[in-house]
From Swiss-Prot:
Renumbered zinc finger spans (TFIIB-type): 19-52
MF terms in GO: RNA polymerase II complex binding; RNA polymerase II complex recruiting activity; RNA polymerase II core promoter sequence-specific DNA binding; RNA polymerase II general transcription initiation factor activity; TBP-class protein binding; zinc ion binding
Similarity comment: Belongs to the TFIIB family.
CDD domains (UniProt xref): CYCLIN_TFIIB_rpt1, CYCLIN_TFIIB_rpt2
Source taxonomy: Eukaryota, Amoebozoa, Evosea, Eumycetozoa, Dictyostelia
Protein name (Swiss-Prot/TrEMBL): Transcription initiation factor IIB
Gene Ontology CC terms, in alphabetical order: nucleus; protein-DNA complex; transcription preinitiation complex
Localization: Nucleus
Top-rank lineage group of the source organism: Eukaryota
Amino acid sequence: MLSAAPKPTPQNKKQSFYNKLWCMVCRIQDPDIIEDYAKGDLICRGCGVVVGDRIVDEHSEWRTFSNSESTGADPNRVGGPINPLLRDSALSTTVGKGSKDSGTLTRLQNKSALGTGDRNLLAAFKEIGRMADHMNLPQTVQDRANELFRFMDDKKSTKGRSVDGMVAAALYIACRQEHLSRTFKEIAALTNVPKKEISRCYKIMKETFASVLNLQTISSEDFTSRFCSTLKLPNDVKKGAEHVSKMAMDMGIVAGKSPISVTAASIYMVSQLSPEKRTQKQIADVSGVSEVTIRNAYKDLYAKRDQLIPSDSPYFSQVQYLPTN
């Protein structure tokens, strides 16, 4: 008994943009469904019930056939995989090669096979893939960005907007959702889209998703590990910076400061206590915040330095030697 969840309503929009499989026995929100490719069955791992059978494999044919027949026919039984993000699921026919006029027919057929909307979506998805590859982002982030852009396109919110800007903003949100946060400056540097344009498109997307997505507040810990890695700082400095930034946020010392500036200031403070010192300029180049911003945040941390550095830390004895700014 295979069933799909109903289309999103104002009550369940927050869960997903697409239909999900549902086990009528377990009746849990996210059932653990596995697929038996040999038998074509969908099985609930929780209760063992077969929730679907005779499932058609929608992936591309993976076997390679030798073209030994004189007819020259292609024995592959399917084309590309179905793309659920396209309005017609990318199902279409193609003109085979053969006569001298087939090239013209193929171009005309490809132009008419997809509607204008789907052609625009395909172009956007291709750009998302290119940017994601350039940023070394995992497939999960790319898939999430595709979903976000498709949702915006359905809402007609992409009309009159910069496609590159909307794509970059979708990647920014997708990174946050997948706990791989990137700054606007990082996205701008890697996508060649102006920072202001990304910020503007992000605000538009955030307003559109206000009733659908819960964008969690960025924490300083989201950036500490990556910044320290780029600065080639040892693990003890990274852990110390994470502790300082968390304590500063919990104590309300840096109220009103952005998590990125707090992270940068925390890394600067702990690095000054260690043999692996880094300048404010070096940290500014990596974090994307100005040296002035780092200094202002550092002043707040410096005022409470004895409380931020634990007494059992190997760096505690060096607190008195911290620079004042």
